[in-house]
Amino acid sequence: MARPIDVSQLIAGINKKKGLDENTSGKISKPRFLNKQERSKQERLKENEESLTPTQSDSAKVEIKKVNSRDDSFFNETNDKKRNPSKQNGSKFHFSWNESEDTLSGYDPIVSTRAIDLLWKGKTPKNAAESSYMGKHWTEKSLHEMNERDWRILKEDYAIVTKGGTVENPLRNWEELNIIPRDLLRVIIQELRFPSPTPIQRITIPNVCNMKQYRDFLGVASTGSGKTLAFVIPILIKMSRSPPRPPSLKIIDGPKALILAPTRELVQQIQKETQKVTKIWSKESNYDCKVISIVGGHSLEEISFSLSEGCDILVATPGRLIDSLENHLLVMKQVETLVLDEADKMIDLGFEDQVTNILTKVDINADSAVNRQTLMFTATMTPVIEKIAAGYMQKPVYATIGVETGSEPLIQQVVEYADNDEDKFKKLKPIVAKYDPPIIIFINYKQTADWLAEKFQKETNMKVTILHGSKSQEQREHSLQLFRTNKVQIMIATNVAARGLDIPNVSLVVNFQISKKMDDYIHRIGRTGRAANEGTAVSFVSAAEDESLIRELYKYVRKHDPLNSNIFSEAVKNKYNVGKQLSNEIIY
């Protein structure tokens, strides 16, 4: 067995490979300990050697050239002008050796800090990561790309809440689902200039016009939300799917659509808006659609004459419609669509029996082949409305608009205290002077309306008109015309007229006498703050009000404050002891 190699021979072989001196290659030197001065001297010598001898990595960096970089001529040109030409070719550092030995003189790194990089720094959108994770917004997607989450966001955006089994998704725009005929589409977008549907229109039209199954519909939405067009468009769509009828057949079968509304003013407003659409649509489609209204104030002879050539759409108040049916002025065999507009107001005005009577008559007189569709619209959902819906509607779709706070009308509510009518008028004069017309003042009694109009005539320069139930139909229409054409600045009206008014841009609503019910209060102040405009509602409270109503009013004013500007007078709080109990509940 061979003897193992000596350690000295192994070390000598390693040193030989490294090119060390042969005299020391075979010797093992004993470690020698250095003092502090010797160690410092050795470190300085080592640093000088490293600085004078470029490493392999440094040499590689010198040879690398910058390629395919962005064009920085604009930024570099500016920086070059600021440099001192005499120093551009000089060394960056001054050492004891020659400049030719400076290894950094030609150093041009491929990566450097540039002005353009500094400008672009931080320009990445903050929500870039969120967008890449969550995906595109529903407005950026096509219809087939929409998923359940997108439809849910769309409903949240427009404050649409639905229930009632399978409910169709809302319209994203007028054209996409091809529900509306092209000729009617041109009327809506080009002639009437409605670029996009309102929330109530978005959810009503696809659910009412679903050809697979005509379902009943109950919509809860505030006034001024576009409800009229929401039911007029489906009526016209359904009519366009059948051939036009001659006048003789219209007389024999009666109207195709029946629209009930609580007041004369609202009936006439619906007729006017519907005729605005049908007049243009008739020219586009050659479909002669006749719209007739039946309201109180017109004699039976006048109604009989207007119905002599039949009609396609009938708009009526419940009482006058029953009179016409009992006098055999019309028949209702072919009513395909029945609309109850402002259903809660009809109930408030005592029309519940008349409404149910009409619904029964329509069902009894209808031909067996007619599949009637019932649409109901209301601003508030009450037990009576629910009872009617349960009794006369078949598995309806329920849709509520404006549940979210952000969709509330932009109304500032101000509640002031006044001892009597004289005190109210004294406080009212400077208020109305601050607002542009039109202005609506609501009162509870006709005598107050006449007294208030006389006060304005004597003590101000403002022109006023009066609207209440004692006026004849011609007087009411004349008053509304004066108000709509800005010939008078203020209209004094009772609750009866509150629902039927459709006056745009009302800047101020005054409750000179607070209403007896909260529903009426809500409908009154709803005359302003419409179509995303801001409005103001001022209410005067005296010492003779119902305490429960004032407590309810206080809660409503505190809860519905979209502008964060509501004012509830301390005098009213102290008089009716409201606000204190709520504070105690919060504290304890």
Curated annotation (Swiss-Prot):
Subcellular location field: Cytoplasm; Nucleus
Enzyme type, top EC level: hydrolase
Outcome after substituting residue 449 to T: In PRP28-66; no growth at 37 degrees Celsius
Gene3D superfamilies with a match to the protein in the record: P-loop containing nucleotide triphosphate hydrolases
Taxonomy, superkingdom: Eukaryota
Domain Helicase C-terminal: 427-579
Residues covered by region (Disordered): 15-94
SUPFAM superfamilies, per database record: P-loop containing nucleoside triphosphate hydrolases (SSF52540)
Annotated ranges, domain Helicase ATP-binding: 208-399
Basic and acidic residues: compositionally biased ranges: 35-49, 60-83
Annotated consequence of substituting residue 546 to S: In PRP28-56; no growth at 37 degrees Celsius
Consequence of substituting residue 317 to I: In PRP28-36; slow growth at 30 degrees Celsius, and no growth at 15 and 37 degrees Celsius
This enzyme's EC code(s): 3.6.4.13
Keywords: ATP-binding, Cytoplasm, Helicase, Hydrolase, mRNA processing, mRNA splicing, Nucleotide-binding, Nucleus, Phosphoprotein
Residue ranges annotated as motif Q motif: 172-202
Phenotype for residue 319 to E/V: No growth at 15 and 37 degrees Celsius
Function: ATP-dependent RNA helicase involved in mRNA splicing. May destabilize the U1/5'-splice site duplex to permit an effective competition for the 5'-splice site by the U6 snRNA, resulting in the switch between U1 and U6 at the 5'-splice site. May also act to unwind the U4/U6 base-pairing interaction in the U4/U6/U5 snRNP, facilitating the first covalent step of splicing.
Domain notes: The Q motif is unique to and characteristic of the DEAD box family of RNA helicases and controls ATP binding and hydrolysis.
Family stated for the protein in its record: Belongs to the DEAD box helicase family. DDX23/PRP28 subfamily.
Subunit and interaction comment: Component of the U5 snRNP complex, composed of at least BRR2, PRP8, PRP28, DIB1, LIN1, SMB1, SMD1, SMD2, SMD3, SME1, SMX2, SMX3, and SNU114, associated with the U5 snRNA.
Protein's recorded name: Pre-mRNA-splicing ATP-dependent RNA helicase PRP28
Species for this entry: Saccharomyces cerevisiae (strain ATCC 204508 / S288c)
Gene coding for it: PRP28
